[in-house]
Amino acid sequence: MDREDNLPVQPDKPPKSLVRPILNLETTSSSSSSSSSSPELLRHLQAAFKRHRPLSKMQTTSIGPRRSVAPQRQASRNTRLVTAEGQRSQDVVTLSQSLAANTLTQDTTNNLAITSVAGESASITQPTVSEHFNPSDRQMDFGKSAVTSLESNLDVQRKSQSLIGTSQDMEWDATNQAEASHLDACIGSKHQNLPSVDSEVSLKSEYKDSSSLAKIQGQLGEFPNFLNQPRTRCSAVGSSWATTTLIHSSSAPMLNATTHVSRSYVEADSNANPHAVQSQGNLPSCCPSSKVSNILHPNKDATASEMPASTNDPEVRVKETDTSKQQQITTGLEAPVGSSIYGSDGQANARLPEELHTSVSSQPQKSDKHEKVASSKGPSAPRKRNYDPDLFFKVNGKLYQRLGKIGSGGSSEVHKVISSDCTIYALKKIKLKGRDYATAYGFCQEIGYLKKLKGKTNIIQLIDYEVTDKTLLQEVLNGTMSNKDGRVKEDGFIYMVLEYGEIDLAHMLSQKWREIEGSDRTIDENWLRFYWQQILQAVNTIHEERIVHSDLKPANFLLVRGFLKLIDFGIAKAINSDTTNIQRDSQVGTLSYMSPEAFMCNESDENGNTIKCGRPSDIWSLGCILYQMVYGRTPFADYKTFWAKFKVITDPNHEITYNQLSNPWLIDLMKKCLAWDRNQRWRIPELLQHPFLAPPIPHEPQVKTIKLFSLIAESCGSDDDKANSMISQLEQLLSNPAPLPRNDVLDSRDQNQQLLSRVSELCIQLQDRLQGLEGEN
């Protein structure tokens, strides 16, 4: 263009103290007045800047940055700008460029440059900081007083509202706090001839202005001193869109900490009064007609607690009201504006943080999606778990944290858990799906037995339980379950919270025999007697309750706080009141501990009676446990296969091998438990009175007699067979005299006299023997 040839020579590099030109709003002259400005006026302006400059991080009571929303009635005037107005704006740009060059050499020490441009055309000044435009800028409110004053000056209103909505042109107004406060003072007085500190930046993104603005970019350069003051950048697009940018003093010279918040005004009323925006980075609520869809915090370190308490909504949202407008603004801001205004000057471009470059059009889609998800949740939606099932079990509303798995088998698991009161328990989890109803019935029946045995010290205690299949549990407890042939099809679990035991009897025996192995030692009888008595007492407890366990083995006796307790009633059976035995439908138990009648259940014996299982079956299992405690193996451990075990156990002529022991009562006790005929087996009350547990106490006279004979035997010597024979005869006559042959002539008194005579003869003979030994010596 012709006007561009008359531009002054651009300096190589503008000084760092260069600031943007300040436009005098009340000047009506068409020529430049910057060169004729008096030094006194310059000092007044510097003093005004220092007076109204707020501290960057202190709370002040001074007037903050405010933005005046243009009345709706001015929109039609702004949209009817003609080509001549654009030409005059370009002239002003050229003139402003010339004045900026003159100002560079005028005063470098004051760090302030003033340029006054007069004319009817709108003034355009290059922005002080180069940055990538973001449509999410902060909106500012200038207040009611500023709106009233600005409306009185139509010329200023026309300059501040140079909007071209149909051609995607945008005008950006940048004002700092000092300029805003000074502008209110100047316009409020109206009659004072002080220069206004307000500056207007009108940037046109397309058409002829884009080339002129790109050239001004290189001339103005960086303004670090000017950036030390907080300032705002405002823009208005059309009649319903407005954006503002707050530039903190701490962000100079780059805009790394700037705040960009975009708002959409939906058909704003001409009398709308937007709320003031706080200058400390807090986001106020939007005007009543605005909706929320996007949030951008002013600072990375800002938190929700920093939001003002007066806000109605802690988040600033954007509602997508017009799709075509949104697409037009997004395109105009991201591509044409960014490229035409900032050009290719790398020094003037300030990169914003990547998290602040959020597309306006993408955020409403996320909020809409969130609303759809929220609306899809109805009363029928499953309730989300408030705990991690991999770390916790929930039984009847109580949480138990997993500590480790104790054991598992089939579809059952036993876990070590801890409750909320820091108590350790064992949690048994049984999966019901796929199991036959008979087994499921037995597991549910175990709960009933444990509830019945609650409070028994030698029976494991049930703390809590839950059966997910409530119908199955109710049928079992009521005894009305009829379908026992099929399998459970629904997903169901049984949770049982039990006492936690340190170790079971099987592991105790394994450790005990590992210590004895390789030595000549045998099992400690006191240790054996102590735990055998506890085993008998535990089984006696369930027998008194008419319950047959049917699966007694070392693993089902658990050591809890030093005492053995009976566990696992999964296949236990209750004995009817009118019988002493029970009849089973199938063989149950562990092979090495099963009784002969358990193998031959439902068969007939030699008398034609049906073989049933009962209390004697548990006695056989107890005999196998005692045999393992004494010898370290079961009675039929040498038979490996099922059929080999079945053959020897069901054979009444098979004799169990008992190795020689120091205590013959222990062998006798095992024989009383392992009698093949179930009617010959001792009952538990009798076993508790067996001499192994209750050895007989000898009478005092007998002890003295034995001691006397031992002294006589020592005096006679071990080589004197005749004397030892007489001593043995005397012991037998005194301890257990054999009855004499029956004689009808002699009565009992005569027989007793004969026994005494016999004792006397032996004593006389023994006395003579002792005297003969003394004569020989």
Swiss-Prot record:
Region annotation Disordered: where it falls in the sequence: 1-41, 57-79, 274-387
Role played: Involved in the regulation of the onset of mitosis. Involved in a pathway that coordinates cell proliferation and differentiation. Implicated in spindle pole body (SPD) duplication. May be a downstream regulator of auxin signaling in the formation of secondary roots.
UniProt feature, compositional bias: Basic and acidic residues: 314-323
Enzyme Commission number, as recorded: 2.7.12.2
InterPro entries: Kinase-like_dom_sf, Mps1_cat, Prot_kinase_dom, Protein_kinase_ATP_BS, Ser/Thr_kinase_AS
PANTHER family: DUAL SPECIFICITY PROTEIN KINASE TTK (PTHR22974:SF21), MIXED LINEAGE PROTEIN KINASE (PTHR22974)
Protein's UniProt keywords contain Nucleotide-binding: yes
Family: Belongs to the protein kinase superfamily. Ser/Thr protein kinase family.
GO molecular function: ATP binding; MAP kinase kinase activity; protein serine kinase activity; protein serine/threonine kinase activity; protein tyrosine kinase activity
Domain Protein kinase residues, every copy: 400-693
Residues annotated as catalytic: D551 (proton acceptor)
SUPFAM superfamilies: Protein kinase-like (PK-like)
Entry's Gene Ontology BP terms: negative regulation of mitotic cell cycle phase transition; nuclear chromosome segregation; protein autophosphorylation
UniProt-listed Gene3D superfamilies: Phosphorylase Kinase, domain 1 (3.30.200.20), Transferase(Phosphotransferase) domain 1 (1.10.510.10)
Residue sites binding ATP per the record: I406, G407, S408, G409, G410, S411, S412, E413, V414, K428
Catalytic activity, as annotated: L-threonyl-[protein] + ATP = O-phospho-L-threonyl-[protein] + ADP + H(+); L-seryl-[protein] + ATP = O-phospho-L-seryl-[protein] + ADP + H(+); L-tyrosyl-[protein] + ATP = O-phospho-L-tyrosyl-[protein] + ADP + H(+)
Keyword Kinase included in the entry's annotation: yes
UniProt-listed Pfam families: Pkinase
The protein's name in its UniProt record: Serine/threonine-protein kinase MPS1
Biased composition (Polar residues): 274-293
